[in-house]
A protein has these predicted regions:
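Long, intrinsically disordered low-complexity tandem-repeat segments
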Residues: 364, 368-386
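Short, Lys/Arg-rich, polar N-terminal cytosolic tail immediately upstream
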Residues: 2-23
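Membrane-embedded alpha-helical bundles of multi-pass transporters/translocases
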Residues: 19-359, 371, 383, 389-480, ...
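Intrinsically disordered and other compositionally biased segments
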Residues: 10, 16-17, 379, 388-391
């Protein structure tokens, strides 16, 4: 949605292009698709375990095993989806193909037919998750490519995550408002999802700033994916993202059980989720300003410390501690805003630095760039590093690995935490002291320990993940020449 009266683009001035893309209409249009995608994610990761365990009578251990199996399948395919995105870097096309499949699958998952069991759950989870992955990988790569400066990339991510948090709040609040029972409420939620997906999806596809032309990837699948992991900064950012992500995934898989059986306030589960995500949405402008003052990485560190300081108290709560838990939801929600916006923005900056290095190599080496490209085509991008030139990071491959880690975290959280609770004697509806203590420990204390690990890793690798200075063309050219001796 650019103003037809605006001046013609000046290709020699990237900042001017960035300013045009950053107009409010463009930012809002890009972010719009984040709403239905997040609206779909919350029921998948929060409501589905309880829906199939309590509503359909499957055992908690069986539901956990099915979730683990489906998410392992899904996670393994994400890097391949990312590689395919690089081979055919048409972000809008991938999204347009994925959204109808996602809509149909969500209806089947949240409104299962009579007699649906573990096989139905597995099949629909795989279908929905694959469609969701195709859409989100292309969508995230689009956002990373359209911003020309670090500030622009942060704003595109913040727009996407602001819409996403609105979608999460709607998905958390609506089931209880649509019907008295959770089963009926989730079934109606699925039918509300379809027009949301169509409307917001079309808004983004038609009105968002067009992604820039991106050279198609040429490396074989494994070579391209391995090249991404071979980049030290990306590999370390991914490791921190994994450690931090599983710390957040365990509470997501167990929160409704905690509210129902530890706090004994099942009817308030939706309200607590709304508090959590509204606080996260409200915090996005704050984290944007903090990141501009102290850097994105240090702002993320501050949010992790806040999350640990607040969530450490959750495992000590008991029946009736509703005000205390509400305060924990609000304060940990503030920390969530940074978790959602800053890591993808750091990844977008890594991709931009890689593009700057490749661009500088082209100017510095002239025809040797063609030689490097030929090597890349024949032997894969990983081989380019052997020739002394930086292996360029591809957005699709990186976001494929990013989604892989996200899904692996959720798979481990559901596939390990739920069976662990069963082994420790907890079953949905249990009220004895030993069972609720086990649930409180898994929900509150395990994530805090994992978050400490993420903090330590991020601090250790801070200089590599977020260098003090961006890569300037002369420096990038020097990197290209390094290794040529």
């Amino acid at each position: 949605g650019l103003d037809p009266q605006s001046p013609a683009p000046d290709p020699s001035n990237p900042d001017a292009s960035s300013d045009r893309a950053l107009r409010t209409s463009g930012l809002v249009a890009y972010g719009a698709l984040g709403l239905p995608l997040a609206f779909a994610a919350l029921p998948i990761y929060v409501h589905v375990p309880r829906l199939y365990a309590e509503g359909l009578g499957l055992s908690l251990a069986l539901v956990g095993a099915v979730l683990l199996a489906a998410r392992v399948v899904d996670a393994v395919t994400d890097p391949l989806i990312g590689w395919a995105n690089d081979r055919l870097p048409r972000r809008r096309l991938w999204i347009a193909l994925a959204l109808p499949v996602l809509g149909v699958g969500m209806v089947g998952l949240l409104a299962p037919p009579t007699g649906a069991g573990a096989l139905w759950l597995f099949a629909l989870l795989v279908l929905v998750s694959l469609a969701y992955s195709v859409a989100t990988i292309a969508y995230n790569a689009w956002g990373a490519e359209v911003g020309r400066t670090p500030a622009a990339r942060t704003r595109f991510v913040a727009s996407r995550e602001a819409f996403a948090l609105v979608g999460v709040v709607l998905a958390a609040a609506l089931p209880g408002l649509l019907a008295a029972g959770e089963l009926a409420g989730l079934a109606r939620l699925a039918w509300i999802f379809l027009p949301l997906l169509a409307g917001f999806g079309l808004w983004t596809l038609w009105r968002a700033p067009a992604p820039p032309a991106v050279r198609a990837g040429t490396a074989p699948a494994w070579a391209g994916l391995r090249a991404a992991l071979g980049e030290p900064a990306f590999a370390r950012l991914l490791a921190v993202f994994a450690a931090n992500g599983i710390a957040a995934a365990i509470p997501s898989a167990t929160v409704l059980f905690f509210v129902a059986d530890v706090l004994q306030a099942a009817e308030l589960g939706g309200l607590f989720l709304v508090l959590y995500f509204v606080a996260a949405a409200a915090s996005l402008p704050l984290w944007l300003r903090v990141s501009q003052r102290i850097g994105k990485l240090r702002a993320w560190l501050v949010s992790m410390v806040l999350a640990v300081a607040v969530f450490a108290w959750a495992g000590l709560l008991g029946s009736g501690d509703l005000v205390a838990y509400g305060l924990i939801c609000v304060l940990s929600g503030l920390a969530l805003g940074a978790d959602l916006s800053l890591p993808p923005s750091l990844l977008a900056d890594l991709l931009a630095r890689s593009r700057a290095e490749r661009h500088a190599c082209g100017h510095a080496e002239g025809s040797s760039d063609g030689r490097a490209e030929a090597i890349g085509r024949a032997e894969g991008r990983a081989e380019m590093r052997v020739k002394g030139r930086p292996a360029p990071l591809e957005a699709g491959a990186c976001f494929g690995w990013w989604n892989f880690v996200t899904k692996a975290n959720l798979a481990l959280a559901a596939g390990l935490a739920l069976p662990l609770l069963a082994v420790l004697g907890y079953a949905p509806g249990a009220r004895d002291a030993a069972a609720t203590a086990a649930l409180a420990g898994v929900y509150g204390f395990v994530p805090v320990m994992l978050k400490f690990g993420a903090i330590a890793l991020l601090w250790r690798w801070r200089g590599l993940i977020e260098p003090a200075l961006p890569v300037a063309p002369p420096l990038a050219a020097a990197v290209c020449r390094g290794g040529e001796g």
